């Protein structure tokens, strides 16, 4: 079941929040799959959530929904993983910003170069690069409620309702 809240931030950008609850990793992947089906390229997804919250799990579902398959792994040590497929017009670039502490560190990941691409950028530990994220990025916060349960909040900007009623 989803709950929806509308509010305006200090910059005047209307934000929409869509809240979902998942009860297993499979549910989280299924939610990600539905998110992936609604992406068209050029989006930046900014994840928030602690270790083991499910950021890579939901990214696996997003990749499936985009038609890129489920071979998604955490980019913790590589910092960035690219998922491309010859017959898929959109690619997925998956970042882990856990160890990024400066603009110089961020520059070495190629983040800004990828933003010029029509790819979807999925950014774990996005709070480490808040000031460099586009204002219209899609924010996904994953709250771990138990070993299996997650509360997942999707925040969009300027009336973007693509993620309303997922799974209903």
Please report, for each region that a protein language model flagged, where it lies by residue:
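Hydrophobic anchor at the beta1->P-loop junction of P-loop NTPases
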Residues: 45-47
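Conserved lysine of the Walker
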Residues: 55
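Short phosphate-coordinating micro-motif centered on Lys-Gly-acidic
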Residues: 13-18, 64, 104-106, 112-168
């Amino acid at each position: 079941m989803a709950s929806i809240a509308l509010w305006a931030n200090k910059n005047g950008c209307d934000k929409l929040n869509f809240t979902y609850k998942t009860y297993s990793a499979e549910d989280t992947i299924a939610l990600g799959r539905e998110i992936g089906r609604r992406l068209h390229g050029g989006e930046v997804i900014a994840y928030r959530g602690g270790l083991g919250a499910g950021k890579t799990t939901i990214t696996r579902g997003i990749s499936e929904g985009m038609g890129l398959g489920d071979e998604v792994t955490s980019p913790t040590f590589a910092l960035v993983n690219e998922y491309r497929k010859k017959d898929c017009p959109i690619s997925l670039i998956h970042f882990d910003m856990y160890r990024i502490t400066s603009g110089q560190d961020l520059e070495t990941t190629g983040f800004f170069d990828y933003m010029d691409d029509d790819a979807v950028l999925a950014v774990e530990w996005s709070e480490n690069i808040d000031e460099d994220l586009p204002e219209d990025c899609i924010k996904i916060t994953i709250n771990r409620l138990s070993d299996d349960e997650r509360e997942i909040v999707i925040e969009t900007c300027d009336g973007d309702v693509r993620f309303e009623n997922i799974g209903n």
